[in-house]
Swiss-Prot record:
Ubiquitin-like protein which plays an important role in cell cycle control and embryogenesis via its conjugation to a limited number of cellular proteins, such as cullins or p53/TP53. Attachment of NEDD8 to cullins is critical for the recruitment of E2 to the cullin-RING-based E3 ubiquitin-protein ligase complex, thus facilitating polyubiquitination and proteasomal degradation of cyclins and other regulatory proteins. Attachment of NEDD8 to p53/TP53 inhibits p53/TP53 transcriptional activity. This is Ubiquitin-like protein NEDD8. The keyword Acetylation applies. Coiled coil: none annotated. It comes from Homo sapiens (Human). GO terms for molecular function: protein tag activity; ubiquitin protein ligase binding. Changing H68A: Decreased interaction with B.pseudomallei Cif protein, leading to slightly decreased deamidation. It comes from the Eukaryota. Belongs to the ubiquitin family. Residues 70-72 are annotated as: Interaction with UBE1C.
């Protein structure tokens, strides 16, 4: 089934997934298309952050559903003087 992943810039990435695919696999597909490592991705669906170990079916994702991609950038160590 085709779903869309929307980035913060408004870009929509179309991805073909199976209901049995884990969120981890969806992140791998985003990496294939956008080059963003899965560990930097946070996927949001229905206002909730998705767990890597759950499947698309667990979240009741259907064809045409839109997931939101937020980047989790590693924090630095405070302000430098």
């Amino acid at each position: 089934m085709l779903i869309k992943v929307k980035t913060l810039t408004g870009k929509e990435i179309e991805i073909d997934i199976e209901p049995t695919d884990k969120v981890e696999r969806i992140k791998e597909r985003v990496e294939e298309k956008e080059g963003i490592p899965p560990q930097q991705q946070r996927l949001i669906y229905s206002g909730k952050q998705m767990n890597d170990e759950k499947t698309a079916a667990d979240y009741k994702i259907l064809g045409g559903s839109v997931l939101h991609l937020v980047l989790a950038l590693r924090g630095g160590g405070g302000l430098r003087q």
